[in-house]
Regions:
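Positively charged, amphipathic and often flexible ligand-engagement surfaces
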Residues: 11-243
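Short, positively charged and aromatic/hydrophobic N-terminal segments
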Residues: 4, 8-12
């Protein structure tokens, strides 16, 4: 089955200065709440004081999580679970806006956490397979691996210890599992670009996955941060490899 017979893509000319379209789904209350929130977080002093108060409140076990979820979290996140995101997905879809579910958990250090994150990423791919308003899936490799190990793996002259090599093999297995699921369900998946000093190993894995799963349709996508001075040449080299 061709990717393009299952999913329909349209080229739409957008005018980003047309706020009537951009904020069509938002009520005046939503817009006023967002305005106040952005005014508050634009102040370094307020942010610094607020962070200290938040940590203090958490130590005292005060119920601040509810407040955070109804303010800052609500502004920037669709939900804590896939099901919580469903109303937003439906609302955006009604106006022709697609959603990409991005499970943004990073900084973990235990293998069990990485495996759990992998399973949740796969759940987002399964959701995208059954939801017409989710055209792509995405994942960050820093969510399924130790950052320090990615740093070492990107420095080719550094030899890894046996335990580190084993951990690296587990990372590769997780990436393969995610991309294989995307291929089987015919869901395009982005491998998110990360910090420049760990990007080399991520690019290597992305290329391997593209070679493996993009033989019939385009399933695996690498992403490129074009503000980097070296990325245009990298993009050209990718094009040559693709040809």
């Amino acid at each position: 089955n061709s990717l393009y017979t299952k999913r329909h893509y349209f080229c739409i000319v957008l005018n980003f200065e047309n706020t009537k379209i951009a904020f069509k789904l938002k009520s005046n209350l939503d817009l006023n709440r967002a305005y106040v929130l952005f005014k508050v977080i634009s102040s370094p002093i307020i942010v610094k004081i607020g962070k200290g108060l938040m940590l203090f409140a958490l130590k005292l076990r005060l119920p601040v999580s509810f407040i955070v979820k109804k303010t800052i979290f609500k502004q920037f996140c669709g939900g804590e679970t896939i099901s919580e995101c469903s109303p937003t997905i439906k609302s955006l879809g009604s106006q022709g806006v697609g959603t990409i579910l991005d499970y943004s958990v990073e900084g973990k250090t235990h293998e069990d956490d990485f495996d759990k994150t992998t399973d949740i990423i796969i759940d987002t791919i399964v959701k995208a397979h059954t939801e017409k308003n989710i055209p792509f899936a995405v994942f960050k490799i820093t969510g399924i691996s130790k950052f320090s190990l990615l740093e070492k793996a990107s420095q080719k002259e550094i030899n890894l210890h046996e335990s580190e090599a084993n951990e690296l093999a587990k990372i590769e297995a997780r990436i393969l599992k995610i991309c294989k699921t995307a291929h089987e369900l015919n869901v395009p998946v982005f491998i998110d670009a990360e910090e420049s000093w760990i990007q080399d190993v991520i690019d290597t894995w992305a290329f391997q996955m593209m070679c493996l799963f993009n033989k019939e349709n385009t399933i695996v996508y690498n992403t490129i941060q074009m503000y980097r001075h070296d990325r245009l040449e990298f993009l050209k080299s990718c094009l040559q490899k693709a040809l």
